[in-house]
Structures are given as C-alpha cells and as structure tokens.
Regions:
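N-terminal alpha-helical transmembrane segments of multi-pass membrane transport
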Residues: 1-78, 88-95, 106, 420, ...
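Membrane-interface loop-to-helix entry segments
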Residues: 24-31, 39-48, 170-177, 199-261, ...
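Extracellular loop-to-transmembrane helix junctions
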Residues: 10-46, 89-128, 148, 326-333, ...
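Flexible loop linkers connecting adjacent transmembrane helices
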Residues: 38-64, 86-88, 92-96, 100, ...
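Extracellular/periplasmic helix-exit of transmembrane alpha-helices
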Residues: 33, 113-121, 125, 242-259, ...
Length: 487
C-alpha cells in the first residue's frame, strides 16, 4: 500500500516541481537581482551589521534579530543536514551547485519578501503586527487578487501541518536518535496497523509531542525567546564541526568542487548515468534549497512582519542574511562534506545516515562522538523549525478564518498530532509530501513578487537615497565638531 501511495506522491511531486515552477523561482530571483543591482553582494556587509543591531523605533512586537531568529528557527532544520544529503544522493553532486545558485538568487527574493512584509503589514485590535504574502498580495496587488492570497494562506497552513513544519522534522529527529541509541533496531516493538519500530521511535515521538505542546501554547514571543537562544548556539556548533571536516580534508576540496560543477551540467560524466540528467540535478538542488532556506516560499515574511522597525528596507536586508547563513554557509559545508567523503555513493544509506557517514569518515573523532554531535544538532535544529512553522501556520489560518481562538486551538492540536505521527512515516514519503506542498505554497508568492518587483525597487531607491544623505550629513557634522575642537 505504501509503495502505491509513494508512487502517486512521486508523480505529483514531479509535476509540481517541473520546469515551469523552477523557471519561475529562478527567474524571479534573477529579475530582482538585476533590478536591484546585485544588492545581495553590495549590501551584504550592511545587512550582517543590522542583523545584530536593534532598532528601537517603529511598530512591531520583537527585535529584528528576534524576528530573524524566528525565521531561522523555521529554516535551519533537517533541510541543512538531511535535505542536502538527500539532494546529492538523488541528483548527484551537481545538485549542490544548483542549490547554491538558487540561494544566491534567493537572497534577492528573501530581501523583497522581508521588505514587502513590513511595508504592507497591519496591526490587529490586540496590537499584534501581522504580515506576509497574503497581506502584500491583497494590499499591494489589490482586492481583486485576494483569492490568490487565500490560496497562499491555505497551502501555508498545509505546509505547516504536513510538510516542513512537522513530518519531515520529527522524522529526521527520530531517525537520528534511533541511529545513535539503537542502530541495529534490536529494541523492536510491533504497533498494530502501523508496523514494527524501535522503542526509541516510540519514546522520541512521545517526548517531542510533549515538548512541542509545551512551547507553542506560548505564541510568537515564547517561540522567539526560545529561538534567540537555541538557533545561534546550535548553528555555530554545527558550523564549527562541518568546517573542521572540510579543513581536515582540504586537499580533497578542489577535486570536490570540480566534481560538483561538472555534475551540475553533465551528471552522467560523474555518476555513470546512475542519477540521470541535468534537469534531475537542478530539480533536486532547487527543491531542497527552497526546503532549506525558504526563499520564495513566502514563510519568512510572516516572521519579518513582527519585527520592531519602521523601515521596510532595513528588515528586507536582515531577512536576506537568513538565506546567506542557511544555504550559502551551512548547506554548502554539508554538501561538501558529503561529496568529499563519498558518502553520497554508499549504497543502503538514506537521509541523516548519509551525513552521519560523512562526519564519521571525515573527522578524526570516534564514530560515536560524531554521531552524537550530529544527533544533538539535528534534534535542536528540527525542534526549533517545528516551533517556527506552527507560528506560520497559525497566521495563515488567521487570514483565512479571522481571529478565531477556537479554530487556532484546533489547528494547534492537529499540529501536535502531526508531530506525534511523523516518526512512523517513511523517509521517502515525508520528503515527497514536503516538496509538493512547498511548490504549491511558493507559486502564489512568486507571482506576487513578480507583480510587486517595481515597488521593491522604488522603496529600495528611496531608502538608500535618504541613507546616503544622512551619512553625508553625519560626516559633515563630525568634521565640524573636530574643527571646532581644534580651534
């Protein structure tokens, strides 16, 4: 039965992530990159500076850094550890190249999303700042496009329940925990109607369900406070170990880069025809890249709208750093690790097992230690992603049904139920379902970004004209003070 369902899901996935959607996502990022004059390169330094610098004025509930951490909590997850490995195994090393290309263009996309989220956000009767694609579609494109905003909100709520938010994250956690505590699956238990699983899976599902339920009841501020502490710390830990792996194998890096680039355009020359065409490499790279950094998906703007700032451009730049950290840095290191160690070519490995193999064979530490580090990173990454996506899903539901506490509570309980179910699903089914809903969610958002690209360019020019004048005035004032001091 599962094989038949998986076959149907794969066909739907291939249709959703066909050439049209990939062209839409890549061309949207390219359009914004060109119209903004390579802003993701020119203003990256300023963006990183503002990322950790709070702005005290302006509407909003949380700092820009807290908003970024909330967004990063939803983006830095299993996609960085499991998703990259899955993409390279399915699409060859070339998938990493297309993932990086999509992320570079996606930085401009994420900038536009953050800018529009703040520009078109609203404040409800409770004083909460609300925003995201549904609001910039409705207010920016006009009331006639409200149906498109509702389509986005519907699929956004579904992605939270069935995609990135729950199934893939808890499945990744349970796989990592089982791989560490019960690699031989000797602690087996048969669950009627479901199959045979390790007791570790059962315990993990119960513990995860309890922890998630305890946090999401607190809403965005509790999620933000947890994310602010956990996300930066765990990202640094994972970055150090992944970078160490690359440095310990630095002699292999040039050949790995050649392999990645060659496989991006001619996969058969590298894989011997096992993986397939350039389209397969591109499809896996772009799809997994979107899963990881969410640029173009429309999720991050929902968190960006809660940032305490009066300048849409400023928050757009801060949002942009999320894609840089998530994919350009973390995913690239994971991908290099998998290619350098040849983990992607080892038969019988899937998901987190591929990355675990890379760490165990690429670092001069014991297998148990490497597996423990990876498990801890994956658990925390995935846990914060689960929290972030509950917030996204609730905002989508609010847009569809209004501020109905009863419906929000029902959504939360369904979300908690999905967390409980996730560990018992197959890895293939989990990732296919996530890809399908990602694509359906990205489509209306990318249409809006094309339509509102002119607004993004105009708002950017206005801000930096004023910013340049302010810098000049500040410089003149500083010179005047120095001259007065000399006299």
């Amino acid at each position: 039965m599962w094989s038949a369902i998986q076959s149907v899901l794969k066909q739907i996935d291939d249709f959703v992530w066909g050439v049209p959607l990939m062209v839409l996502i890549l061309s949207g990022g390219l359009l914004l990159t060109v119209r903004l004059g390579l802003l993701q390169v020119r203003k990256l330094g300023l963006a990183l500076k503002w990322m950790v610098q709070n702005e005290e004025e302006g509407e909003g509930e949380i700092s820009s850094f807290a908003a970024l951490c909330t967004a990063l909590s939803a983006t830095i997850g299993t996609g960085n550890i499991v998703g990259v490995a899955t993409a390279v195994c399915a699409g060859g090393p070339g998938a990493l190249f297309w993932m990086i290309v999509a992320a570079f263009l996606g930085m401009a996309t994420k900038y536009a999303e953050g800018l529009l989220a703040v520009k078109y956000r609203v404040v409800d009767e409770s004083g909460h700042s609300l925003g995201g694609p549904f609001y910039y579609i409705e207010k920016g494109m006009g009331k006639n496009w409200k149906w498109l905003a509702k389509v986005f909100a519907f699929f956004g709520a579904c992605v939270g329940l069935f995609g990135i938010g729950t199934f893939s994250q808890v499945n990744g956690i349970s796989s990592a925990v089982v791989g560490f505590f019960d690699p031989d699956k000797s602690l087996a238990v048969t669950i009627p109607g479901l199959g045979t699983y390790s007791w570790v899976v059962v315990i993990a599902s119960l513990v995860l369900t309890f922890c998630v339920a305890a946090v999401i009841i607190g809403g965005v501020k509790r999620i933000a406070s947890v994310s602010q502490i956990v996300v930066p710390f765990m990202a640094i830990i994972y970055f150090i170990f992944a970078l160490a792996l690359v440095l310990f194998n630095i002699k292999e890096v040039p050949q790995a880069i050649v392999t990645i680039v060659q496989a991006a355009f001619n996969p058969k020359a590298v894989t011997g025809g096992v993986v397939g065409s350039m389209l397969v490499a591109m499809q896996n790279g772009v799809a997994r890249g979107i899963f990881s950094n969410e640029a173009g998906l429309g999720s991050a703007p929902i968190a960006a709208a809660a940032a305490q700032t009066k300048e849409p451009v400023r928050q757009g730049l801060v949002s942009m750093t999320g894609t840089f950290i998530d994919t350009i840095v973390i995913c690239t290191l994971t991908g290099l690790s998998v290619v350098i160690t040849g983990a992607w070519q080892v038969e019988g490995l899937e998901g987190v097992q591929v990355t675990t193999y890379a760490f165990q064979n690429g670092l001069p530490f014991s297998n148990q230690f490497c597996a423990a580090v990876l498990m801890i990173c994956l658990v925390f990454f995935a846990f914060t992603t689960i929290l972030g996506w509950d917030y996204y899903g609730e905002r989508c539901l609010e847009y569809l049904t209004g501020k109905d506490e009863k419906k929000i509570k029902i959504y939360r309980w369904l979300y908690i139920l999905a967390v409980f179910i996730g560990p018992y699903m197959t890895v293939a089914a989990v990732w296919t379902i996530a890809d399908i809903f990602n694509g359906l969610m990205a489509l209306p958002n990318m249409i809006a970004l094309f339509a509102l690209s002119g607004v993004v360019v105009k708002e950017t020019k206005r801000f930096f004209d004023v910013y340049a004048d302010q810098k000049m005035a500040k410089k003149k004032s500083s010179v005047s003070v120095k001259n007065a001091a000399k006299n």
